[in-house]
């Protein structure tokens, strides 16, 4: 991130939830519990997949990669937010702000790319089951995970470089709880702010929409294949293998659409801050719950793993 323009401003101030002083302790406790649950839930999923040989398959390799991404995404944002809820000193250095934006966008886009890869995995499993082991080999799956991570890092670098090459002329208050693009654009000055804003918005929407359309295409083929299965039991079994992934996709893109496709007009900073909770705290919190409850195979394995750790003498 060399060449970033920080000659005018050396630090920013994260306003966060300062508009709700009487709620800050309650918000701290709530977000802390959700954060810990997110970490523990994803770590439990990873430990279960690692310890259960029956789960050593591409579907759960992608799930582990997704869990790692969610842990890193929340670590990039929530600890700083929790610290600010208990502090009156909310300044953040220029480079620290740039780093937070880079990591949050990188892991956020990696999450979207991995969901797309998981959609393709379900498509191959249901529409081409006889070719599954060939199309979803270990090498191929590792390559897809690596490409998802590389794509996320590139997106994070592109967005962060574009924003932090702008000039920030004196104003330092970011009306959000982390270094996000829209509130930072409001602090920027110069003739190129509008061009950068449109360019960054176009890149983000194109990437997210492209991932969503690919997932939609995968499920169009999946639904067509499921409808051809003669027995109701067979159709239910096929659909159950996709239920958890499909639910997470709906949650992920549902909240993303609220943020990126909201109508233009006057927006209160407090409203934008509260809306930011949906994709920084709520979505990562719900994801391990959905996967552990909607995926029967994973749920049974997680119960077995927990029972083994708690009562090893009975195993």
Swiss-Prot record:
The chain crosses the membrane at residues 26-46, 55-75, 100-120, 140-160, 198-218, 239-259, 273-293. One of its GO terms (biological process) is detection of chemical stimulus involved in sensory perception of smell. It is a multi-pass membrane protein. Keywords: Cell membrane, Disulfide bond, G-protein coupled receptor, Glycoprotein, Membrane, Olfaction, Receptor, Sensory transduction, Transducer, Transmembrane, Transmembrane helix. InterPro entries: GPCR_Rhodpsn (IPR000276), GPCR_Rhodpsn_7TM (IPR017452), Olfact_rcpt (IPR000725). Residues 47-54, 121-139, 219-238, 294-315 are cytoplasmic. One of its GO terms (cellular component) is plasma membrane. Residues 1-25, 76-99, 161-197, 260-272 are extracellular. Odorant receptor. Belongs to the G-protein coupled receptor 1 family. This is Olfactory receptor 10H5. The lineage of its organism: Eukaryota, Metazoa, Chordata, Craniata, Vertebrata.
